């Protein structure tokens, strides 16, 4: 059965979110593995991230966030972990999942080993989630979470530091 046939956001339950949290930790470990290579090859960032940063400089922060956090993960996951493996490669889904994983990596434009590790590793983890649990919603949710953390991390850090600021500066903001 295709993941598109039984698409249902109600499957995102607390146990599913807990499982996705473990996969999120695995994705972060993948990023830690890729970072030394990226640092050596490209100053610590990917060409894809540089392009997103450039686009961000010309787009409203919230609108860009909606695209990065909602639109891109839904479209990428549906294409790479549902349409390619289950429709285009119907009857040969394992090969289709691998093809989808490679296509996802290709979409992010890797040109160095560090970028291949970063995006290829992320793609394999997201693919495993979709393949193992036969629920595209899980990989979409995981992808959205990862992008949200990456996109809004400065805001999250500031919010976390706000209580510390108040302690040291006695509520004088």
Residue ranges and their predicted role:
Residues 28-40:
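Alpha-helical transmembrane segments of multi-pass membrane proteins
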Residues 1-21, 41-44, 84, 134-137:
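Membrane-helix interface linkers and caps
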Residues 20, 28-31, 61-173:
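Transmembrane helix-loop-helix hairpins at the membrane interface
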Residues 39-58:
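Membrane-interface interhelical connector segments
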Residues 5-13, 52-60, 89-91, 116, ...:
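Helix-boundary and loop/linker segments of multi-pass membrane transporters
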């Amino acid at each position: 059965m295709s993941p598109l046939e039984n698409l249902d956001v109600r499957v995102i339950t607390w146990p599913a979110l807990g499982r996705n949290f473990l996969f999120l930790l695995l994705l972060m470990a993948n990023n830690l593995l890729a970072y030394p290579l990226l640092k050596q090859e490209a100053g610590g960032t990917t060409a894809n991230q540089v392009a997103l940063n450039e686009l961000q400089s010309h787009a409203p922060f919230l609108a860009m966030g909606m695209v990065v956090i909602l639109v891109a993960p839904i479209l990428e996951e549906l294409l790479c972990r549902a349409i390619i493996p289950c429709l285009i490669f119907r009857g040969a889904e394992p090969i289709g999942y691998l093809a989808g994983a490679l296509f996802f990596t290709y979409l992010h434009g890797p040109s160095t080993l560090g970028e291949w590790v970063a995006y290829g590793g992320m793609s394999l983890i997201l693919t495993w989630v979709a393949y193992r649990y036969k629920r595209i919603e899980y990989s979409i949710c995981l992808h959205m979470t990862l992008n949200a953390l990456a996109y809004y991390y400065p805001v999250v850090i500031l919010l976390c530091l706000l209580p510390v600021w108040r302690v040291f500066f006695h509520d004088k903001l």
